[in-house]
A protein has these predicted regions:
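Active-site-adjacent beta-strand/loop module that shapes the phosphate/pyrophosphate-binding cleft
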Residues: 30, 36-41, 134-155
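A generic structural signal for well-ordered coil/turn residues at beta-strand boundaries
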Residues: 30, 59, 89, 138-141, ...
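Conserved Nudix-box catalytic region and its N-terminal flanking loop in Nudix hydrolases
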Residues: 2-7, 52-57, 64, 69-112, ...
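A contiguous pocket-lining binding segment that forms or flanks enzyme active sites
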Residues: 104-147
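Conserved small/polar residues in nucleotide/adenosyl-binding loops
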Residues: 171-178
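Alpha-helical and coiled-coil interaction segments, frequently adjacent to or embedded
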Residues: 2-16, 20, 25-28
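Hydrophobic pocket-lining residues within nucleotide cofactor-binding pockets
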Residues: 68, 100, 122, 149-150, ...
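Acidic, metal-coordinating catalytic segment for phosphate/diphosphate chemistry
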Residues: 26-69
Length: 179
């Protein structure tokens, strides 16, 4: 991909102003109502008094644990309220993940969350990418990391009791296998 294509396909700055802000709900993810004014994408006009609700969130670290000795990745299954409300499958499959604490760096959070949710230690950690998870709904930024791990001798369940985590660990190959 050319540098021009990378710029064209990247998020872009846009002139905007928050003209009013109201807290609608506190909690794990506070909900705010904002009134904003912003320039149109082509710069020919300005939209005024646009109402938007946004969930406020801390940044998150999401981990892809990979064991090169077994060519397996670790995924987890746990109860998720969003899955329970939208599907018959409340025990959702996902990658280990968690929120950054205070001014914690994303890579440090990735190593900590990997240990808390799987019992695994990161032998090496590399950033993959960062993304806004759902920019029309919330301000959460998720930082993805690859962590090299050794899965030998690990239990099939993990999680922190004080965070009400009941996590099942699953191991699977990222490569297609013959049936």
């Amino acid at each position: 991909m050319s540098a021009s294509d990378r710029r064209r396909l990247a998020d872009q700055p846009l002139d905007f102003t928050i003209t009013a802000e109201e807290r609608l709900a506190d909690g794990f993810r506070p909900l705010d109502r904002l009134f904003v004014s912003h320039a149109s994408l082509d710069g020919t006009q300005r939209f005024e008094g646009v109402r938007r609700e946004v969930l406020r969130a801390r940044e998150a670290a999401i981990i892809l644990p990979y064991d090169p000795n077994t060519d397996e990745i670790v995924i987890i299954r746990q109860f998720r309220i969003g899955a329970a409300l939208k599907t018959p499958n409340a025990a959702a499959l996902e990658l280990p993940a968690g929120l950054l604490d205070g001014d914690e760096k994303p890579a440090v959070a990735a190593v900590r969350e990997l240990r808390e949710e799987t019992g695994l230690e990161a032998l090496a950690t590399a950033p993959i990418f960062s993304v806004l998870t759902s920019p029309g709904l919330c301000d959460e930024v998720a930082h993805y990391f690859m962590c090299i791990v050794d899965t030998r001798g690990l239990p099939l369940v993990a999680g922190l009791a004080d965070e009400h985590e009941d996590i099942c660990l699953l191991y699977t190959s990222p490569s297609p296998r013959d049936s």
